[in-house]
């Protein structure tokens, strides 16, 4: 239970809730705690502790910690009894607020029994509600042993301890627990039983409890520290009952002196042994503040400015709107109807009061934590309104509610705003009183037939995916479109008017015509085409419900064409459910969003006070509807408040006005005085004299905190305290100068009391540092005689001076500079408010100042000044005629242009040819000359070829040749030859190209067939792999079930480990790192802007100085020495320079001097004085002469070089010395401060309640493997067998005239052969051998000439 986190009011605190005993209890003893006569004296280290148990040697240290107030009183809380206990001992003032902590001074009562020394003193208890739901710290002595425990005790209602030395009539009884209580800390420490006093220092800071202890010496040493994470609110000292202890015997009395601690700054002094020998509470007195400012226990004499004693509010103005109703938040939280995360509910509470303590007590709280808000600050605060959201928690999705989580609950149901000031409440309701309201808030879901979720009574519905649609969305297809579908025909129906039907197209495949292809297939969660699906996945925003669940459009509509569109219940996708029941209670989440902190009338009345009167004219503390501060109320007449407004703010968000609802009066709120207080301190005195500058003593006495002083009065400078008014008395020397000719004079008390009987050693007197002296009776010096040097010789010198008057203007994109394009950084940067706007505003002001400065300089230069140019000096050289073109590179539109322009691309067509090896050679041959067409005929495998593409010029040429050949045969027949060759060669080119394409087709077919074989093998391997995966996964699932059973008993340890991991891997770590980077960059940017402001100040000062020098040096001759150059000014020139002006000064500079005696004036006859005019009176050879101040030239004194005076007196006024504070701020130890902050950074651990019904599901991949096997068979049946294209071999035949010539030649050959055979002797011999073959020649008729043509 986290109720104990909050500080409970004193009136609600009780000691324990278990009545251990009722015997011998009464309410007769009305003792109240004694108040000590001694006060806290920290000068010897009382109340201090050694800082983090560290050692410091021979040093003085300023340290801020939890200390008692110097001069505070102690209260004795020791209670002693014998037989009876009083009920009043367990109520205030004995039951006290712990607040920051306490310092205890405990008497060690020593009793001797049977020659044995016993140590007795009371036990102290520190806790909050003192029951077993919170931790209680108990420090109990056991005769030399300190037993210190921090446990969840069940404290008795009337607890007490008994005397160990002599026994007691009663039995010790201070807690009772049925079992051993849960303890965070349990340890024993020893202490010195012989010590007279024991000192304890207990305090808490940011959830950590610290304990310090000492039994020798008064500074305490570190004992232990313990992180509780809660606030300890109360403490009390348990009564000690004993037979022997008597209040009448000093050595047997009990004393337990306690004083509260507060966060204060102390000055500590450590000696050479590291022991604290002296201490000062910096805010306890005026002297202590001076000691802390100087970090010295013996400050030097001087005047110091103080700040710690400026304001003392004398009253409190508290205002709340009366009679507001109760918000009744608890009634709404305990309502039996609980919504699901899908339809979470919201309620806004305003203009009412709520009691957070009561609220958390009336609901069964599991945890309560806050984000961007200290939950302890809710008590007593007011808000504009409180927004409360709630819903039941599905058990398996509890982790989704962690801040920054992206689980289903926050991505698709309810988004927690981590940037708002909010608190998260986890609570539960009894099972019998809960009704889960599972409702779909989506209107477009309900339009198309969404009914109920059909889940059990305690199941909570939540969305896994959210979808948004346009207002004209309809999930049904158009009947007129899908009626023509042959395959994959979807359901259809009539959509409502104004909506669009589901998009469906008729498509044609290789085997099926009119195949329907519709959108959002197979469903909107896993659609193939998310861009065309009208259902878009979305993430819920802050304050938004899920727009709608997904709809499987395949299940929307009917087979009837004229029915209205509706969807079946199983068409709605993307939702889940789980039970909210745990331990017979339903777990519920509620988010409190606090709007307008300290700016409204929705107030917590946990610490409610009564409305008070408005005190005017004095400094008061105020609490106006939760807004706190200090100020002075002054009644005014104001008509600018509306009836719903009651506070007036300035542009910086500070409250400056107030309208009282009770009296209808209006007030302006002025700040309390926080001005300058000067303390005049004389070394080794006991206190300083004070000067409240510009304040009347009447205001000081009513509003300013100070030690009562009998001496105060109003002076010209302000109210003076602890000094005597003696302004009629003057002194010539003063160590404590207050300014304006006044001084604080100090005299030792002993001598002053004898002469005047004045108790204060300080006097407020007039300061007159000099008296007039005379040299002789006739002519006397006025103001003294001095020795100076006057120039006697000069030389002309030149001097160059540059003054910057402007600079380049700077503008910065602050957001881009810090974050670039990182969205998370931009989101976090927005929380820094108007920082970036202020940066740009400052830079704009800087730029405006630059403009104004430039204008002022220009105006000064335009009036009677000629700018000099081309001045060659020893500091400058001409920079004319420098050529920068080589640095600029290529400029203009011609850079990077190619030989082909865009115009050429538009005017000419580009033709790309498939080249099998001769087109490139042809182009290289022609070189762009089309007339070389036939000259560049290429040979490809022995065949003459040309590219099959002709340009317009080539077509015209060949056509003309063919036409001429046909018109004038036979003379022009030769003109047709080029045309014929051109056609034939290009046909050859097409032929060889087709041959290559045929070969490529074969290669493609072979490669594709090989790919199909590879795919087939791959699917086969995949099927085998899936089979293996199935066996391995099932084996792992079996092992996982066994492992979960083994981890069941040890799950608590795992949860603890996860908590430790979460503490290191917190979701906020990324934001912390981003915030560090932003802080670093903002610091750099702020430093840069600060430098810009500093620079513009210098530039503005430089511009003013430049204008002054233009007016005094350039336009005229300056009488000032070393202002226009070095020496006496002669002439100055000015020239423009980058970002400024260059001055060239000419002056004459002294080279030699003469030492003379001079006097500021002379007194003649003792009653009339003269003073020199633009020179000096010098004493030369016992006579007085006059000389100029810039050149030694003595001349007689005359009425032309003197000024006459009525008297010879001199009035002296001297400015006071102001001592600047040169002390270096003392920062606390970095590691200690870091540990204090870091240990409070905690994370909410996820709910890791073990579900014993977890079962690892075995995978069944049989169906998937069958599908893959079928795919393999289908691929096998789709093997491509490309038909090979036949190749035709063409033989080129000879022309007909060649064949005719061959026949003629053959006949001639036969005739010659016949002649030889028949007409010569050789032929007769042959005939004889042929056996009359010639005779048979003409009768043979079977000779056949066979010709074979394969074509």
Swiss-Prot record:
Position of sequence motif KxHxx: 1347-1351
Known glycosylation sites: 19, 29, 58, 114, 132, 171, 188, 192, 251, 335, 355, 433, 454, 561, 664, 684, 703, 725, 771, 776, 793, 924, 1181, 1211, 1221, 1226, 1240, 1247, 1255, 1276
Keyword annotations: Coiled coil, Disulfide bond, Fusion of virus membrane with host endosomal membrane, Fusion of virus membrane with host membrane, Glycoprotein, Host cell membrane, Host membrane, Host-virus interaction, Lipoprotein, Membrane, Palmitate, Signal, Transmembrane, Transmembrane helix, Viral attachment to host cell, Viral envelope protein, Viral penetration into host cytoplasm, Virion, Virulence, Virus entry into host cell
GO terms, biological process: endocytosis involved in viral entry into host cell; fusion of virus membrane with host endosome membrane; fusion of virus membrane with host plasma membrane; receptor-mediated virion attachment to host cell
Transmembrane segments: 1296-1316
Spans annotated as Heptad repeat 1: 1001-1051
Official protein name in the record: Spike glycoprotein
Organism of provenance: Human coronavirus HKU1 (isolate N2)
Organism ancestry: Viruses, Riboviria, Orthornavirae, Pisuviricota, Pisoniviricetes
Gene that specifies this protein: S
């Amino acid at each position: 239970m986290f109720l104990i986190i909050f500080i409970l009011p004193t009136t609600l605190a009780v000691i324990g809730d278990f009545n251990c005993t009722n015997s011998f209890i009464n309410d007769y003893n009305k003792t109240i705690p004694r108040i000590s006569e001694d006060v806290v004296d920290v000068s010897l280290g009382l109340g201090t502790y050694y800082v983090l148990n560290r050692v410091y040697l021979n040093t003085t240290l300023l340290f801020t910690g939890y200390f008692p107030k110097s001069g505070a009183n102690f209260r004795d809380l020791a209670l002693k009894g014998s037989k009876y206990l009083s009920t009043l001992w367990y109520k205030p003032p004995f039951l006290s607020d712990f607040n920051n902590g306490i310092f205890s001074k405990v008497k060690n009562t020593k009793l001797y029994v049977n020659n044995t020394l016993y140590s007795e003193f009371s036990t102290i208890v520190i806790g909050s509600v003192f029951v077993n739901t919170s931790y209680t710290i108990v420090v109990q002595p056991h005769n030399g042993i300190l037993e210190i425990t921090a446990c969840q005790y069940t404290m008795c209602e009337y607890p007490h301890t008994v005397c160990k030395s002599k026994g007691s009539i009663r039995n010790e009884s201070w807690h009772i627990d049925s079992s051993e209580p849960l303890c965070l800390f349990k340890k024993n420490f020893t202490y010195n039983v012989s010590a007279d006093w024991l000192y304890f220092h207990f305090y808490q800071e940011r959830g950590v409890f610290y304990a310090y202890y000492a039994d020798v010496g008064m500074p305490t040493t570190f004992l232990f520290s313990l992180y509780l994470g809660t606030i300890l609110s109360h403490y009390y000292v348990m009564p000690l009952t004993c037979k022997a202890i008597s209040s009448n015997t000093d050595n047997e009395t009990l004393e337990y002196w306690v004083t509260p601690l507060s966060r204060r700054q102390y000055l500590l002094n450590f000696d050479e042994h590291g022991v604290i020998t002296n201490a000062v509470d910096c805010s306890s007195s005026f002297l202590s503040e001076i000691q802390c400012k100087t970090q010295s226990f013996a400050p030097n004499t001087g005047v110091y400015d103080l700040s710690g004693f400026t304001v003392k509010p004398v009253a409190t103005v508290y205002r709340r709107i009366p009679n507001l109703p109760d918000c009744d938040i608890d009634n709404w939280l305990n309502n039996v109807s609980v919504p699901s995360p899908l339809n979470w509910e919201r309620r806004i509470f305003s203009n009412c009061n709520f009691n957070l303590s009561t609220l958390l007590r009336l609901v069964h709280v599991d945890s309560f934590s806050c984000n961007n808000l200290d939950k302890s600050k809710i008590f007593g605060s007011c808000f504009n309104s409180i927004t409360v959201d709630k819903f039941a928690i599905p058990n398996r999705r509890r982790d989704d509610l962690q801040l920054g989580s992206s689980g289903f609950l926050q991505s698709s149901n309810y988004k927690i705003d981590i940037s708002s000031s909010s608190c998260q409440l986890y609570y539960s309701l009894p099972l019998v009183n809960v009704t889960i309201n599972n409702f779909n808030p989506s209107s477009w879901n309900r339009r198309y037939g969404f009914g109920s979720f059909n889940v059990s009574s305690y199941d909570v519905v939540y969305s896994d995916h959210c979808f948004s649609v346009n207002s004209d969305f309809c999930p049904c297809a158009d009947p007129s479109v899908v009626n023509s579908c042959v395959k994959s025909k979807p359901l259809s129906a009539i959509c409502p008017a104004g909506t669009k039907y589901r998009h469906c197209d008729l498509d044609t495949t290789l085997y099926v015509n009119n195949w329907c292809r519709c959108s959002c297939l197979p469903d909107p969660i896993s659609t193939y085409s998310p861009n065309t699906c009208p259902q878009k996945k979305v993430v819920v925003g802050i304050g938004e419900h899920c727009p709608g669940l997904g709809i499987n459009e395949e299940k929307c509509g009917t087979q009837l064409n004229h029915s209205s569109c509706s969807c079946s219940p199983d068409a709605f996708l993307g939702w889940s459910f789980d039970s909210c029941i745990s331990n017979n209670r339903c777990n519920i989440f509620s988010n409190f969003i606090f709007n307008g902190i300290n700016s409204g009338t929705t107030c917590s009345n946990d610490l409610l006070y009564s409305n008070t009167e408005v005190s005017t004219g004095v400094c008061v503390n105020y609490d106006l509807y939760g807004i706190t501060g200090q100020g002075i109320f002054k009644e005014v007449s104001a008509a600018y408040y509306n009836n719903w407004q009651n506070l007036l703010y300035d542009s910086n968000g500070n409250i400056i006005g107030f309208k009282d609802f009770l009296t209808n009066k209006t007030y302006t709120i002025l700040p309390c005085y926080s001005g300058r207080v000067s303390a005049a301190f004389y070394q080794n005195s006991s206190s300083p004299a004070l000067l409240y500058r510009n304040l009347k003593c009447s205001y000081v006495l009513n509003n300013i905190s100070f030690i009562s002083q009998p001496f105060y009065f109003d002076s010209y400078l302000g109210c003076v305290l602890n000094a005597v008014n003696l302004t009629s008395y003057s002194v010539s020397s003063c160590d404590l100068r207050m300014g304006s000719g006044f001084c604080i004079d100090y005299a030792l008390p002993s001598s002053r009391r004898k002469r005047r009987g004045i108790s204060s050693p300080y006097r407020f007197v007039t300061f007159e540092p000099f008296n007039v002296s005379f040299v002789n009776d006739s002519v006397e010096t006025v103001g003294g005689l001095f020795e100076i040097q006057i120039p006697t010789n000069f030389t002309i010198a030149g001097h160059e001076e540059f003054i910057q008057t402007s600079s380049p203007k700077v503008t910065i994109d602050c957001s881009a500079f810090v974050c670039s394009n990182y969205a998370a950084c931009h989101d976090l940067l927005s929380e820094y408010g108007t920082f970036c706007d202020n940066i740009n505003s400052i830079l704009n002001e800087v730029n405006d100042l630059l403009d104004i400065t430039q204008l002022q300089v220009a105006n000064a230069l335009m009036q009677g000044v000629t700018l000099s140019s081309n001045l060659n000096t020893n500091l400058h050289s001409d920079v004319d005629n420098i050529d920068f073109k080589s640095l600029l590179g290529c400029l203009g539109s011609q850079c990077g242009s190619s030989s082909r322009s865009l115009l050429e691309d538009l005017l000419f067509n580009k033709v790309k040819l498939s080249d099998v090896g001769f087109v490139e050679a042809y182009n290289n041959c022609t070189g762009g000359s089309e007339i070389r067409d036939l000259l560049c005929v290429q040979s490809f495998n022995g065949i003459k070829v040309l590219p099959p593409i002709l340009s317009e010029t080539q077509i015209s040429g060949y056509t003309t040749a063919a036409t001429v050949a046909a018109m004038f045969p036979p003379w022009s027949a030769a003109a047709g030859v080029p045309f014929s060759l051109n056609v034939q060669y290009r046909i050859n080119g097409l032929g060889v190209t087709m041959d290559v394409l045929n070969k490529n087709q074969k290669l493609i077919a072979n490669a594709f067939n090989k790919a199909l074989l590879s795919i087939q093998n791959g699917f086969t391997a995949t099927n085998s792999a899936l089979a293996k995966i199935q066996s391995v996964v099932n084996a792992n699932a079996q092992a996982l079930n066994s492992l979960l059973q083994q981890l069941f008993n040890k799950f608590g340890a795992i949860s603890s480990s996860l908590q430790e991991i979460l503490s290191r891997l917190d979701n906020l770590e990324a934001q912390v790192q981003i915030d560090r980077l932003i802080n670093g960059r903002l610091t750099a940017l702020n430093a840069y802007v600060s430098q810009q402001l500093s620079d513009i100040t210098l530039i503005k000062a430089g511009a003013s100085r430049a204008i002054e020098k233009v007016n005094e040096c350039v336009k005229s001759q300056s009488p000032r020495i070393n202002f226009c150059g070095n020496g006496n000014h002669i002439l100055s020139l000015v020239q423009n320079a980058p970002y400024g002006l260059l001055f060239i000064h000419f002056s004459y500079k002294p080279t030699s001097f003469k030492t003379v005696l001079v006097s500021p004036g002379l007194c003649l006859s003792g009653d009339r004085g003269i003073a020199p005019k633009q020179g000096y009176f010098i004493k030369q050879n016992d006579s007085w002469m006059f000389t100029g101040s810039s050149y030694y030239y003595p001349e007689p004194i005359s009425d032309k070089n003197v000024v006459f005076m009525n008297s010879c007196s001199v009035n002296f006024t001297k400015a006071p010395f102001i001592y600047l504070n040169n002390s270096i701020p003392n920062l606390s130890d970095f590691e200690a401060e870091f540990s204090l902050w870091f240990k409070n950074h905690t994370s909410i651990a996820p709910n890791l309640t073990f579900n014993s019904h977890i079962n690892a599901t075995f995978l069944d991949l049989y169906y998937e493997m069958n599908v893959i096997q079928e795919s393999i068979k289908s691929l096998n049946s789709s093997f491509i067998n490309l038909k090979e294209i036949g190749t035709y071999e063409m033989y080129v035949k000879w022309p007909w005239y060649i064949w005719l010539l061959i026949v003629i030649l053959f006949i001639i050959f036969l005739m010659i052969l016949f002649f030889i055979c028949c007409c010569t002797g050789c032929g007769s011999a042959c005939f004889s051998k042929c056996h009359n073959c010639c005779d048979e020649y003409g009768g043979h008729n079977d000779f056949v000439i066979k010709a074979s043509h394969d074509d």
